[in-house]
């Protein structure tokens, strides 16, 4: 079995080593081929390992870094002052092939800026994009991009996002994904010039299976496998859907935990529904991929708990196995040839 090495920014996220270290240890038991390099404050990391009764070994190592990038740092400042940081070092381990992928729950803007600076973009890509899986009512999942890396885009950039998203989704689905552009209506006359031009470009290529427009109320209805939009729209949609799912889960959970007769009735009536709603829990889909780079970088939610971070590490393992950057590069090459002829 070929090993897969993930560089984990141990200082990233809201809870730092208190979550990243247990997640790394748990991930090792989930994925027998996995090795983890924890980057960050060695004293804090080893302290957490001691609490777990775990010592660094052949599968888990620690590389000390003097500083971390805070969530409040602007990307430009983080880029200038990133030397010696846990996030930068994790990305550099991918760049020099010590690690196969990087996972971080740290500052999104800084992660994107550093990844782009260190790993560079694939040929034919203007900007990287954040993509993540979303649950659907049918029990499957779809993928949406961009989720906040680029708040404004032109049509060519959205077209590139569609090509990259299709390549990633295909590695999960093992079939040609249905690609749609998020719009205010399904009719061809609806929408602004940006989405209309993007749809025009997608309808002219054989590189993706374009199915037209979808509206916001169809995002979770399995109407498409890949949903394309700019980062502003995507981030708002993502946060709204996550908040709605968490609201329903917490409301039913609160009712079921009540000690009164009302709680007893709720446990009888809603136990099956609660189990169904848990499949919509955003933690199960934690791990947004930063596509368009010459390496694999996974962004975890800053607020992720241990199990959610394990899911992000799992996404990194999957993308390494499926050689996602190479798949995207091949798809882009086909598009460039298609446009040339």
UniProtKB/Swiss-Prot annotation:
Pathway field: Lipid metabolism; phospholipid metabolism
Main enzyme class: transferase
Listed SUPFAM superfamilies: Isocitrate/Isopropylmalate dehydrogenase-like
Xref: Gene3D superfamilies: Isopropylmalate Dehydrogenase
Enzyme Commission number(s): 2.3.1.274
Subcellular location: Cytoplasm
Function: Catalyzes the reversible formation of acyl-phosphate (acyl-PO(4)) from acyl-[acyl-carrier-protein] (acyl-ACP). This enzyme utilizes acyl-ACP as fatty acyl donor, but not acyl-CoA.
HAMAP family attached to this UniProt entry: PlsX
NCBIfam families: plsX (TIGR00182)
Name used for this protein in its record: Phosphate acyltransferase
């Amino acid at each position: 079995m070929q090993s897969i090495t993930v560089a984990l920014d141990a200082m990233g996220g809201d809870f730092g080593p208190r979550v990243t270290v247990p997640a790394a240890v748990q991930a090792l038991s989930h994925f027998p081929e996995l090795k983890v390099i924890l980057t960050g404050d060695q004293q804090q990391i080893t302290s957490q390992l001691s609490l777990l009764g775990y010592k660094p070994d052949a599968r888990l190592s620690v590389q000390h870094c003097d500083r971390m990038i805070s969530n409040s740092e602007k990307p430009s400042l983080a880029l200038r002052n990133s030397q010696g940081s846990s996030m930068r070092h994790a990305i550099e381990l991918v760049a020099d092939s010590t690690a196969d992928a990087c996972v971080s729950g740290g500052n999104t803007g800084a992660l994107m800026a550093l990844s782009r600076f260190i790993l560079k973009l694939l040929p034919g890509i203007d900007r990287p994009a954040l993509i993540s899986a979303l649950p659907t009512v049918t029990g499957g999942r779809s993928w949406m991009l961009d989720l906040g890396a680029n708040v404004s885009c032109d049509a060519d950039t959205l077209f590139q996002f569609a090509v990259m998203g299709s390549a990633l989704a295909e590695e999960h689905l093992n079939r040609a994904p249905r690609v749609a552009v998020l719009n205010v209506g399904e009719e061809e006359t609806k929408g602004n010039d940006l989405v209309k031009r993007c749809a025009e470009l997608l309808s002219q290529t054989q590189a993706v299976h374009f199915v037209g427009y979808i509206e916001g109320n169809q995002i979770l209805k399995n109407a498409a496998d890949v949903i394309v939009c700019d980062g502003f729209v995507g981030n708002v949609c993502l946060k709204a859907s996550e908040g709605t799912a968490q609201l329903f889960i917490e409301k039913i959970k609160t009712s079921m935990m009540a000690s009164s007769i009302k709680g007893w009735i709720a446990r009888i009536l809603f136990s099956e529904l609660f189990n169904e709603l848990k499949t919509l829990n955003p933690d199960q889909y934690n791990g947004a991929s930063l596509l368009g780079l010459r390496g694999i970088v996974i962004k975890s939610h800053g607020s992720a708990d241990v199990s959610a971070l394990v899911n992000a590490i799992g996404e990194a393992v999957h993308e390494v196995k499926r050689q996602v950057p190479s798949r995207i590069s091949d798809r882009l090459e086909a598009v460039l040839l298609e446009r040339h002829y």
